[in-house]
Amino acid sequence: MPGSSLWLLPPKSHRLNSILPTLIDQTSSHFGSAHRFLPHVTITSEISPSTHSPNPQAWLDSLEISSGDKIEVMFEKLASEDVFFRKLYIKCHKTEGLKKLAVLCRREVEGFGEEREAAKWATESYNPHLSLLYHDCPSIDASGLAEIEKLAQSTGVNLNGQSDLGGWSGGRLVLVPTDKSIDQWSPIAEREL
């Protein structure tokens, strides 16, 4: 994936921080994928490293994120696409706060500096989701989705956005250089929201 990405993680104290890595591990094992990664909702990608150099933390802290915006991640359902990074994921509702954050962050990507372009992208292209599987295989069929739904339920994750295990409020925005191999994807800056 070219450039860097901004990911939204659950707040440090949220129970999903310990549950979601287990679900990703079980899902990856079930489908024979070697890829493991930090549970996250991608806010935007394709940020040029020159944008946040030489001080990624200072750059992340400089983003004008309003503390008044309620940023909520609400799980909706399991889904699969024939795309490596969206092979199997939890689709999330495009809440107003999440959409506003996506617009603000997308403006940091070359070609989206104007509010209008970033807002169009957030409305037409942004698909908030939490990946459970990166894999080079066909999209997951209905029986595979049903198996992972049972796994999710056994961990307590609520795929319908209900209860505290159906998403989270706020969280941590992290900057990750995603132009490296997946096993090297680690945050280089973090900001509490």
Curated annotation (Swiss-Prot):
One of its GO terms (biological process) is cyclic nucleotide metabolic process. GO terms for molecular function: 2',3'-cyclic-nucleotide 3'-phosphodiesterase activity. It catalyses: a nucleoside 2',3'-cyclic phosphate + H2O = a nucleoside 2'-phosphate + H(+). Belongs to the 2H phosphoesterase superfamily. CPD1 family. This is 2',3'-cyclic-nucleotide 3'-phosphodiesterase. Substrate binds at residues 42, 131, 134. The active site is at 40 (proton donor/acceptor), 129 (proton donor/acceptor). It is found in: Golgi apparatus. SUPFAM superfamilies: LigT-like (SSF55144). It comes from the Eukaryota. Involved in the metabolism of ADP-ribose 1',2'-cyclic phosphate which is produced as a consequence of tRNA splicing. Its EC number is 3.1.4.37. Keywords: Golgi apparatus, Hydrolase. Gene3D superfamilies: Cyclic phosphodiesterase. The gene is CPD1. It comes from Phaeosphaeria nodorum (strain SN15 / ATCC MYA-4574 / FGSC 10173) (Glume blotch fungus). GO terms for cellular component: Golgi apparatus. Pfam families: CPDase.
